[in-house]
């Protein structure tokens, strides 16, 4: 503890280094005597600083506070004005500023010109192409770097080298930024025209990326990669990331496999010592050399040299450097293009008639058959979800934009909003709600567009379709996904699997007579050629399905779905171009439909099957696996002879030729040892993930507050670190300090302490120890947690007003009426709460809540008031358990090989000792009998929180709950009277606790919690049958042991003698655990 607080104090004296600056620490304690000393100390500090007296004497006088109480926050004030950054920066700006080459990029605006050249007037200016979209500023980032540099200028040995490397790189950034002056941001952290007009347009986003890169430099190789990317990304804003990461798709095919992990019948990873040689035809090397040439043409020197050097022996030992280059390339920032260019990208592909009609027919038929296969069971059995598809759609309607702003009346309040949920309510109130009519998206009503930006790829457009499309597609797509869940081919959806399972699937069949074909089909998904066969395949499938049932409601659902496909075959889009809005006929498929993911997966599976059926005419092979994962598909083919160079080359050329016959511009590769797809890559029998999450630039702006973004920043840092890209932790902590500070007045700021930001409360931002989620059990920790719980949820006047309006109330009661067969307060309240929560995405409401939150927080950070909360948190449970455990040293041998080389040492060690897991632990209650029973008769999906509440009710209340949701009385009676009900109690509690303990997030998702090696370190004498208590004791012990091992790199064993008398008490408590939502949990969820 305390590293953060120490840095915070140093940071404050670095930032506010004038005579007028004062730092006042604020302490608190759960001990009432000490607490009164804390209050006394604080008021005397204020008194002294008002009178300009030193605080030193007080620090001595109140030593007991400083020693024994807990730091709550630091209050700092300074009358210093802004030019501080510029002054400090000048010291580092000793180098030659970079000059942008203004001819590198094809599109004029992607060249890093002076802003006024790209946008001659303020009216024409937009920051959308360079907006870092993050609630922290360039000046803060510069400050954070300079703080780190100043703090480390006296480092020695290896640390000194790191300092010099970073200093050298920062000199480039500082000199360039200093030449033009630091751009000042406005209150919303945006950079306006008058600030930017005389500066290079991409200066800010480039500087942010560069700072992120230079603060991730440790070794000499890091330095070389970073220097090259920093210098070149100043000019090349379009293709740099793509150029640098392209070779990876070939590199994975060059490394021999010497021992790997494969999936066994039990879906676990097991080691296999097989040896598979990489067989690489000359053609492949030629392609690789072409890529390296392209890199050199773009001015890259060191990076292609590193790759070239690695090629001499292609060893897996040195492969992590290749992985590093691949990850680093993403950190040059997002490529943000104008919407017009993004849309035209799909349209400028020449439409040729010269295609293989036969293949198209086969492709369409495969899509048709798959759609039928997915839906035939629910359709034949007149599934209630397909009958009540409209209601199901309404219940899960999102609060995203509906494409146009409308004036809406809620009671006396009139507001403007674009949100779907509000439009639905308004339409219902005014009789305009007609879900049976799917509005056209033709030339009269073109589709408004959203955007998706990603590093190293072109900007993609997203359809913002009217909500009718969502309602029409929701239920059918849900059924498709249920089918995909138990179909291994759909890697993305396969039941509770994680990426390690997919890894073991690929390596399993690799051998000297097999090859793997992997294709990136992202170009195909958005191509015009895909549109007709794709939509027609779906339509034909729906026609077949409609003949399988006589239920009018099911037929209506299928017809509406079909109508969305027909409408979208003739789609027009509207694109703002300057002041005019262009209408363009858009023949391609774009994201934005509910079906996007599911339908693309179906199409990509159909595509690879079509291709394989073609090449099977020429070769004899067995298809061992076919997988589709998002934009990528891959298949392992087993031949009856050993694979030779010539075979690989022939198959490769035939596959490409086959794709070409469908005019599919895709990147198809064949290898014998590895694959590379968007989500993961396999090389030398080991699995790698791209650590490419940008920290200081974001894709888009959302409803997030600064606190939320600080948590997201930390969460991104953790994910990158697990994947092999490490940013300096002190720098991340400094960013958290900056982003979580709260301004009281112009010169007064409050900085929360580590305890506030890491305690498991509604304000949690990060973990005090990376990878370890701590649940504080000391008096002070529980005290502060209680204090924060008292101000957790804030009211919003606007939201209350909307919720009180008849429009809103009628909508809720309409939903409840359609859903419920009899009164059910839990569900009705639940729906009302969900709908009210959706209002949060309406900016004025989230702003209002945020202001209330901040002011409550300000009070709390200056003096915590606890109110005696009767709520029990997971901390209370663990606090009760902890005293009964005794620990002693233990030893576990390393017994598994490494298969994920990028993991940090301490995490790697644990996997090598206890093994990894290839599945997600069920934490939403969906496997419980009650959840299955409800979904059998109702479209309502209770959350894990609701199930947890319901399952602990009296039996007759559970019966009423079930009956009100339309479950027949006989089924409800049977359920409550059976053993299943008591099993469910345990099962749901288990899920709920797993959910609270974030067992599927961070690095915990990698560990096998059921490992026998872990179990044997725990001894808990069995006393009486309370499975729930046994469960929590074991889980606590496992987490303690794992956390200890992460921290110390050694093992302990735990013995617990839990008194029987306490067990029943604990069991009762376990039914009242409150879940805490925080920016931290939100960021974890956001990672998903």
From Swiss-Prot:
Q: How does it assemble?
A: Interacts with VP3 (Potential). Interacts with VP2; this interaction activates VP1. Interacts with NSP5; this interaction is probably necessary for the formation of functional virus factories. Interacts with NSP2; this interaction is weak.
- Compartments, as annotated in UniProt: Virion
Residues covered by the RdRp catalytic domain = 501-687
Q: In the Enzyme Commission scheme, what number(s) does this protein have?
A: 2.7.7.48
Q: Which GO terms describe its molecular function?
A: nucleotide binding; RNA binding; RNA-directed RNA polymerase activity
What cofactor is this protein dependent on? Mg(2+)
Q: What does this protein do?
A: RNA-directed RNA polymerase that is involved in both transcription and genome replication. Together with VP3 capping enzyme, forms an enzyme complex positioned near the channels situated at each of the five-fold vertices of the core. Following infection, the outermost layer of the virus is lost, leaving a double-layered particle (DLP) made up of the core and VP6 shell. VP1 then catalyzes the transcription of fully conservative plus-strand genomic RNAs that are extruded through the DLP's channels into the cytoplasm where they function as mRNAs for translation of viral proteins.
Similarity remark: Belongs to the reoviridae RNA-directed RNA polymerase family.
The reaction(s) this protein catalyses:
RNA(n) + a ribonucleoside 5'-triphosphate = RNA(n+1) + diphosphate
Q: Which domain of life is it from?
A: Viruses
* Pfam families per record: RdRP_4, Rotavirus_VP1
Q: Could you list this entry's UniProt keywords, alphabetically sorted.
A: Magnesium, Nucleotide-binding, Nucleotidyltransferase, RNA-binding, RNA-directed RNA polymerase, Transferase, Viral RNA replication, Virion
Q: Could you tell me which species this protein originates from?
A: Rotavirus A (strain RVA/Human/Philippines/L26/1987/G12P1B[4]) (RV-A)
Give an example GO biological process: viral genome replication
Extract the Gene3D superfamilies matched here: 1.10.357.80, 1.20.120.1390, 3.30.230.140, 3.30.70.2480, Viral RNA-directed RNA polymerase, 4-helical domain (1.10.10.1990)
What is any one of the record's Gene Ontology cellular component terms?
virion component
Q: What is the protein named?
A: RNA-directed RNA polymerase
